[in-house]
Amino acid sequence: MVVKGNTSTGTITDFNGTFTLSAPADAILSISYIGFKSQEIAVKGHKDIKIVLQEDSETLDEVVVVGYGVQKKSVVTASIAKVSADDLASTAPVRMDNALKGLASGVTVTSSSGQPGAAAQIRVRGVGTIRTENGAADPLYIVDGMPLEGGLDYLNPNDIASIEVLKDAASGAVYGARAANGVILVTTKTGKIGKTKVTYDFSYGWQSAWKKRDVLNASEYALMINEGAINAGIAPKFSDPYSYGQGTNWQDEVFNNNAPMMNHQVSVSGASEKVNYLFSLGFYTQDGIVGGNFDRSNYERLTLRSNTQYTLFDESKERNWLNSLKVTSNLSYARIKSTNFDDNSTWGTPLGSALALSPILNVYDETEEAIKAQFDKYGTTAEYTPVYDPRNGKLFSIPGEFGEMSNPIAKLSLPGDKHWSHKFVANFSAELQLWDNLKFKTSYGADLSFWGYDSYRPLYYLRSGESSTQSSAYSRKEDGTVWQLENVLT
């Protein structure tokens, strides 16, 4: 239960259905529960509200994917959570893994990074004891019948028709030990009977930090340093603390306000009695609110998909055993480019430095002599190679007295690693309906992945212990191939 228009204000009922919620007198409550129809109730100033939900019998007739087949929800005894395309459209997720947040019971989705395109961790009913080759407790991902490795970042959420999460031991009867941590079945969209449908969706938005920490300004900082010195029995460092004024708020300098994000989606689909087809193209870009303006936190994804199905022949009175033959091909390609920086280190990250660095220090130094003096005082054997802002040519300052931290803006201005990946997934199948209750399906799938990164490190000096005395370039490329041949008789 949430307040409509303010999803951060909500609650859940106890075992008896009782709830307590603080809401405005004119608020509208949005109530939902699995197996019942969602309702919206106006508070109208009432303190006590009695709500009776109506059963949603239509959900029991929904078809869900279970292993090698499909069943109606009303006859399924296993624990399955289903997320439809309409559910996904309401949240507009960037990645498939983030699409499950709050939409599937028993599924925990957590993000350890806020950088654009960052992967989320999915756990189905906690952490299992059987791990994957890399030690993770990830569920088994199957897209259109093809088991996939390396995550689902290549999937365009707009191409997804439904997601089924198999959560109990029943999935182990089909997939074995691979299903120990749950199974996530993804079915992509197909065409619908009727005229050819062409759709184009475009969205453009901006991102900014929603909250900043309260920190000391320069005068307050100088007063506190002086107070600490007096308490330690030494002379105060700053003779006139109030002369420093507001100083530098490093959070304002680090955050990239109004970071853009853009999404293009094009699809062509349709179907007849013999042919079903869907072709789609997606292009998504996002700049990070930290480093996006320096090309240090950016994400770009291009996706192509072709789903086709041909009915070569269907049921005929001339045959009493060979009812139908359908041939299906699902082809997809994804190209992803991204840049990022280390965001899980206390002091080495831009945000960590922005919260701890002195507000007395300026972002830039007026003269190179001041920088050289800092280097001579705190520098080591590293060569003197100051860093200039590529946007305006100004010279970045060196926080010499803060040996464990560097100027975060100077650090962001340096070139970062440029990651890239190409992924091709193809799945071909032929389904033969031998008799009314006997079906044979053969399928072949292949997953080809190519990934790597390119980096360049110029000469620079940020602080003692963080410098580069020689230029270097590095390039790394890897690839992997997974294929599957499957024959199923049901």
Where are these regions (language model features)?
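An active-site-proximal structural segment forming one wall of the substrate-binding cleft
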Residues: L438
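Surface-exposed loop/interface segments of Gram-negative outer-membrane beta-barrel transport/assembly proteins
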Residues: S74, I193-G247, G291-Y299, T303, ...
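Short, small/polar-rich motifs associated with maturation and membrane association
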Residues: M1-V327, V425
